[in-house]
């Protein structure tokens, strides 16, 4: 009796404790089931991610993330030339950074005598403190 109880507990521990038995990442994963039939314009896309069949999805795909976060991801066939070109374009395009208000060329120099938050912090970090 004790052996069968111990064996049952061992089976339960193994069944629930081994990664991969509940899915590739331990939870639900969004997968593309089919590809978009139309070309996706670069101006509506901010980035992309790859979907691999080895990660639990049925087809390989590129999921393009739209600029508007409220819109759904767009699925495309990674073998298509336009998809590869769009991926290369996104890889080359740097993420836009907002300039610091009130500073010139991020040097910590205030514009027209105005002190901005970024300028003050930059000046403090560049000014050596000592006797």
UniProtKB/Swiss-Prot annotation:
It is found in: Secreted. The keyword Cytoplasm does not apply. GO terms for biological process: antimicrobial humoral immune response mediated by antimicrobial peptide; CCL21-activated CCR7 signaling pathway; cellular response to prostaglandin E stimulus; chemokine-mediated signaling pathway; dendritic cell chemotaxis; eosinophil chemotaxis; establishment of T cell polarity; inflammatory response. Its main location: secreted. CDD domains: Chemokine_CC_DCCL. Residues 1-23 form the signal peptide. GO terms for molecular function: CCR chemokine receptor binding; chemokine activity; chemokine receptor binding. Belongs to the intercrine beta (chemokine CC) family. PANTHER family: C-C MOTIF CHEMOKINE 21, SMALL INDUCIBLE CYTOKINE A. Inhibits hemopoiesis and stimulates chemotaxis. Chemotactic in vitro for thymocytes and activated T-cells, but not for B-cells, macrophages, or neutrophils. Shows preferential activity towards naive T-cells. May play a role in mediating homing of lymphocytes to secondary lymphoid organs. Binds to atypical chemokine receptor ACKR4 and mediates the recruitment of beta-arrestin (ARRB1/2) to ACKR4. This is C-C motif chemokine 21. It comes from Macaca mulatta (Rhesus macaque).
């Amino acid at each position: 009796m004790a052996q069968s109880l111990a064996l049952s507990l061992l089976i339960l521990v193994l069944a629930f404790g081994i990664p991969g038995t509940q899915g590739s990442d331990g939870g639900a994963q969004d997968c593309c089931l089919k590809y978009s039939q139309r070309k996706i314009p670069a101006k509506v896309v901010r980035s992309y991610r790859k979907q691999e069949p080895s990660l639990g999805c049925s087809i390989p795909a590129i999921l393009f993330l739209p600029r508007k976060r409220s819109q759904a991801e767009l699925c495309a066939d990674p073998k298509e030339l336009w998809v590869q070109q769009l991926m290369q374009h996104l890889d080359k395009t740097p993420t836009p950074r907002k300039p610091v208000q009130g500073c010139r060329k991020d040097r910590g120099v205030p514009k027209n005598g105005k002190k901005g938050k970024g300028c003050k912090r930059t000046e403090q970090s560049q000014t050596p403190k000592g006797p």
